Structures are given as C-alpha cells and as structure tokens.
Amino acid sequence: ASSGLSDMTGYPDGPPTEIRFSMDIISGYTTFVAVMAALVSRQGTGKGQYIDFSSRESISILLGDALMDYALNGRVQTRNGNDDAVMVPHNCYRCQGEDNWVSIAIDNDSEWRSLCKAIGNPEWTNDNRFALQISRHKHHEELDHLVESWTINFSHYQVMEILQAAGVAAVASLNPQDLFTDPHIQERQSFIVMNNPEAGERFSVASPPWKLSETPCSIYRDAPVFGEHTKYVCCELLDLSIEEVQKLIEEGVLQ
C-alpha cells in the first residue's frame, strides 16, 4: 500500500485494491540486481560495500508513467480499471467457457480497422462513433460490450489466434492451470518437475525466467526439508560430535 500501487489499482468507483501476490518476489529480484551490481564494482575496485535496499521503492518504480505524469505535469492519476489513457478498446473480454477471458489492446485507428476486419466487420464496426480513436474513448463502455458480443463466441485461445494473425495485440488470460499446460511455456521449460519427500514426486517449481545461451541455468535439486542438513552443518562444519548434536535435538535446540 505504501508503494502507491494499491491506490492505482481498482475501478474508478471502487476502493484501492491490494495486489494478490506477495511483493517480496519483486523485492527479491530487485535485490538480485543490486547484489550483481555490487559484485561487478568489487571486480573493478577490489572493495565490497553495503546495500541499503528498500522494498517499497522497488514496488514504486512499477508505477512508471504515473510517477512521470506527476513529476512533469503535477497530475495525479486515478484508478481506471482496465481502461487506458490512449488505447481503446483496452480491456479483458469474456470468452466461451467458464471464466475464460482475453485481453485486447488497440493502439491506433489502423489496428482498429485490422480488428474490425478480423472479426468479420459486423454492422456496429461501421458506427461513426467508433471510427476515430478520440471518439472511441468517449464511447468506450458501449464499445467494450460490443467487442465482448464477438469474443463470447470463441475460446480465449481462439480469439488470441484470430486477432494475433491480423496484427492485433491480444492474449489469453491464463489461470494457474493454463500456465502449466501452455505450449509456449512448456517449450521454454518454465516449470521444472522435482522430487521432494514432503511435497511429492511431481512437485513443479518455476525455473529462472531468463535463458542464457552459453551458461544455461538449471535447478538440480529440490529445496531442503526442515532440518535436513542439521547433522551435516553441526558435525562437518562446526565439528560437533554426533552425540552432542543428538542431545541438542532432544533438548529442542535443533531439529
């Protein structure tokens, strides 16, 4: 909330909306960049340094143009749901099937004409109110309903394929199950199947989202279970006897 992201998220007539995933993930990736920058500096100077990291600031930078708009124009952007200040149509549209959606974004009049052609030029696409982008913005709510009257007849994947083939920005909104079965994600091996004594034999974890051509990343083992390396650390690294370690375990000091 203190990053400003919640205040920007939601619909104009609704309250600020909390993002449903943990921001710690973004903070972790941002910290990784800071660590790498410090290591590069150490290679050149031979000196290490402390990193003063702010989780809040790592999220605030996601606001992008909203921060720039205020810095340059003194204008505070407000919540606008899925609407965009420039692109229209710009929304998530219901598709065939239960809770299936597709995101469509039209950036200019040329893309609008491509969309109209791709969906068969139904009568409403010839309405003068939708001919120009500035006019489409004024009537965007009605336009959204009309676009959805077409998307509802197809699956989200079908809509994506039809519109992308016409050069229109469209992508199926995927749920967690879709992510695991998506052909593109499978081809990239975005999820790796691991074996874990607690999670089971087919426990999938996300692989790094970057692919290096010369030194590819790999996940070679599952995460350790709680206490898995207690005896190794205490005996091999701290030089305690197995009897001492066992006593500490019995006393509840270790596990």
Language model features by range: what are they?
Residues 48-56, 162, 245-249:
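Beta-strand segments within the central parallel beta-sheet cores of soluble alpha/beta enzyme folds
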Residues 89-166, 170:
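Aromatic-enriched alpha-helical interface/lid elements that frame and gate functional surfaces
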Residues 131, 199-247:
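Flexible, small-/acidic-enriched active-site or ligand-binding loops
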